[in-house]
Amino acid sequence: MSPKKAKKRAEGANSNVFSMFEQTQIQEFKEAFTIMDQNRDGFIDKNDLRDTFAALGRVNVKNEEIDEMIKEAPGPINFTVFLTMFGEKLKGADPEETILNAFKVFDPEGKGVLKADYVREMLTTQAERFSKDEIDQMFAAFPPDVTGNLDYKNLVHIITHGEEK
């Protein structure tokens, strides 16, 4: 295949991934990519992943775990590759699983709960920021337990099914 045809094919493949998502979703993925691209070089590499984990409080991530994540990509992880990888993972995923996976990023031990203060901080400082009123409404509807933890698994179930487990 000529270089021009190969380039054209790659461009075509890339444009398909953008048609899988609504513009607002693409913007949200872009914000997530920007947060993970710690060194702002336009690519997510091992150091970016390690720094992202550290920012989430997970400092002892094994090199093998990071290597496995990087190997999932067909090459350097720019935004288009990042979007493609998420597109493949989200194809056919149900909304409950998708929302749960978003919370699990912040719960590396898989406890099913997050500190309410941490959730409040993340929702008011990252991506599409919640207003104080929106946060207050959420915590009024889904109050943390006596230890200050938010049971996000139950929260996601209520969001997606409209009822408590």
Swiss-Prot record:
Q: Which GO terms describe its molecular function?
A: calcium ion binding; structural constituent of muscle
Modification type Deamidated asparagine: residues: 14
The record's account of how the chain is modified after translation: N-terminus is methylated by METTL11A/NTM1.
- Residues carrying Phosphothreonine: 52
One Pfam family, please name it. EF-hand_7
Q: Quaternary form?
A: Myosin is a hexamer of 2 heavy chains and 4 light chains. Interacts with MYOC.
What are the BP-aspect GO terms?
heart contraction; heart development; positive regulation of the force of heart contraction; regulation of the force of heart contraction
Q: What does this protein do?
A: Contractile protein that plays a role in heart development and function. Following phosphorylation, plays a role in cross-bridge cycling kinetics and cardiac muscle contraction by increasing myosin lever arm stiffness and promoting myosin head diffusion; as a consequence of the increase in maximum contraction force and calcium sensitivity of contraction force.
Q: What is this protein called?
A: Myosin regulatory light chain 2, ventricular/cardiac muscle isoform
Q: Which residues bind Ca(2+)?
A: 37, 39, 41, 48
**Annotated InterPro entries:** EF-hand-dom_pair (IPR011992), EF_Hand_1_Ca_BS (IPR018247), EF_hand_dom (IPR002048), Myosin_RLC (IPR050403)
Q: Does the keyword Cytoplasm apply?
A: yes
Q: Which UniProt keywords apply?
A: Calcium, Cytoplasm, Metal-binding, Methylation, Motor protein, Muscle protein, Myosin, Phosphoprotein, Repeat
What organism is this sequence from? Oryctolagus cuniculus (Rabbit)
